[in-house]
Regions:
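Outer-membrane beta-barrel architecture
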Residues: 3, 17, 98-100, 111, ...
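Outer-membrane beta-barrel initiation region
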Residues: 31, 53, 85-90, 99-103
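Exposed, low-structure sequence patches enriched in small/polar residues
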Residues: 238, 303, 356-360, 367-370
Length: 377
C-alpha cells in the first residue's frame, strides 16, 4: 500500500488558492460543403424533382411554375446561408477557490467552484456550482478523515436541432417581404387530393416559447477511520453515501409545425421527468504483515463490505395547450391519447467478506490463500 499526502500548510496559517479558466469556442463549418441556390436548383432539376411521375398535365404546369419562380428568385440574388442562424461564439469561464489550514493534529480544507459554459448553439448553456469540505484529524493511533463534495448543474438545450438549418434550401428566404418570419418556407395543398406539401421554417419554430432544460444536484460524503493497532496491524473502516437528483423539462409550443395536423386539444407537448439515486456503501478491512527471522514473510487481509442503492424515476407528458406563452402543465388539456404518468423503483443490495493470506520463504517459495463470499438481492 502506497500512501501519498500533499504537503501540509504551515501550522496556524490559512492558505488560499485560486484558479480561473477562460476560453472561447467557435463552430468549425469547413466540413459543410453545401450547394448554393443555383447549384441546388440544378441538382433538383436533374434529379427529377420538377417532373410529375403521374403524367398529370396540371401538376406538371404547377411544377414548371414552381421551378421558374425559384429561378427568378435566384436571379434576384436569393442565396440564403442558413448555418449561421443557430450559431454564436461561446464564452466559457470557470473559477475555483480553495482555503486550507490546520495544525499538527487537524487539517481542513474548503473549496468552492463556479462555471458557465456557453455552447456554440444559441440557447445552449450550462451552469455549474460545486463545493467541498475536507477534514483530517489525528490522535494517538487513530486517524479520522471526512470528505464532502456537492455539485449542482443547470442546463439548457436548443429546441430546434442544427440539422434543420443544414437541410433548409438556399433558394428560400429567411424572412418575407415585410421582414417577418413565415411559418413555412414552402406550402402547397392539392385541391383535388387534399394532400399537403409543407417545409417548415426553422426560424419560426426557434422563436416560439419552446425549451429543453434540466438541473441536477448531488452530494457525496466519505468517512474513513484508521486504527494503527501495532506496527504490523492496521484496521480501516469506510462509510460513504452518494445522492443524486435530476429533473428535465421540455416544452414544444402549440404553434410548432409538428402539431399542424393535430386537433386543437392535442397541440403542444410538455414532458417532465425526475430521477433520484441514493447509494450507501461501506467496508471494514484488517491488514497484517510481518517478517520473521529475515526469511519468513507473512501477510493477511480480511474484510467485509456492503452496498445498497435505491433508484426511482417518474415522469409524465401533457398536451393540449391553447397559447404559445402559457407553458405551465396546469394549462394543458390532459395526457396524450393513451398516455399516463410513469414510475419505477429498484433497490439492489450486496454484501460480502473475504480473506487473503500469503507466505513467502526466502523470497523463493510462495504460498497464497484466497477466500471470498458474496451475496446480492
Amino acid at each position: 500500500v502506497v500512501v501519498i499526502e500533499t504537503k501540509a500548510p504551515e501550522q496556524g496559517r490559512l492558505q488560499l488558492s485560486y484558479k480561473g479558466d477562460f476560453s472561447v469556442t467557435m463552430a468549425d463549418l469547413t466540413d459543410y460543403n453545401l450547394m448554393n441556390s443555383s447549384e441546388k436548383l440544378q441538382f433538383e432539376t436533374l434529379a427529377g424533382v420538377y417532373q410529375d411521375t403521374n403524367h398529370s398535365m396540371a401538376n406538371q404546369l404547377r411544377l414548371d411554375d414552381l421551378r421558374n419562380e425559384r429561378l427568378k428568385g435566384i436571379a434576384r440574388g436569393i442565396d440564403t446561408y442558413w448555418l449561421n442562424e443557430p450559431l454564436r461564439t461561446g464564452f466559457t469561464h470557470r473559477h475555483n477557490i480553495y482555503a486550507e489550514g490546520g495544525e499538527e493534529k487537524i487539517r481542513y480544507g474548503i473549496g468552492l467552484s463556479y462555471g458557465e459554459v456557453q455552447g456554440v448553439m444559441k440557447g445552449s448553456d450550462r451552469q455549474t456550482i460545486g463545493g467541498n469540505i475536507d477534514l483530517i484529524y489525528r490522535t494517538g493511533k487513530f486517524q479520522f478523515s471526512n470528505k464532502l463534495t456537492l455539485d449542482y448543474q443547470k442546463t439548457n438545450d436548443p429546441a430546434v436541432p442544427f440539422s434543420e438549418y443544414a437541410q433548409a434550401n438556399p433558394y428560400f428566404k429567411k424572412y418575407n417581404d415585410e421582414g417577418r418570419i413565415d411559418r413555412y418556407l414552402y406550402y402547397y395543398q392539392d385541391p383535388e387530393l387534399l394532400e399537403t406539401e409543407a417545409i417548415s421554417n426553422p426560424l419560426w419554430n426557434a422563436h416560439l416559447n419552446n425549451y429543453d432544460k434540466g438541473d441536477q444536484f448531488g452530494f457525496t460524503n466519505n468517512f474513513i477511520i484508521e486504527w494503527f493497532v501495532a506496527k504490523d496491524l492496521r484496521v480501516r473502516g469506510k462509510f460513504g453515501i452518494t445522492h443524486a437528483t435530476g429533473t428535465t423539462d421540455t416544452r414544444l409550443s402549440p404553434l410548432h409545425t409538428d402539431f399542424d395536423d393535430l386537433e386543437e386539444t392535442e397541440k403542444g407537448l410538455y414532458t417532465h421527468s425526475t430521477t433520484k439515486r441514493t447509494n450507501y456503501e461501506g467496508d471494514l478491512t484488517a491488514t497484517y504483515g510481518r517478517v520473521l527471522a529475515e526469511k519468513h514473510m507473512l501477510n493477511a487481509v480480511a474484510g467485509f463490505n456492503f452496498n445498497a442503492t435505491k433508484r426511482t424515476a417518474n415522469g409524465y407528458k401533457a398536451n393540449g395547450f391553447t397559447d404559445d406563452q402559457f407553458g405551465a402543465p396546469s394549462f394543458a388539456n390532459g395526457y396524450p391519447e393513451g398516455g399516463k404518468s410513469t414510475y419505477s423503483e429498484s433497490q439492489p443490495r450486496a454484501a460480502g467478506f473475504y480473506l487473503n493470506g500469503g507466505y513467502s520463504y526466502d523470497n523463493r517459495y510462495l504460498l497464497d490463500f484466497n477466500y471470498r463470499s458474496d451475496g446480492a438481492s
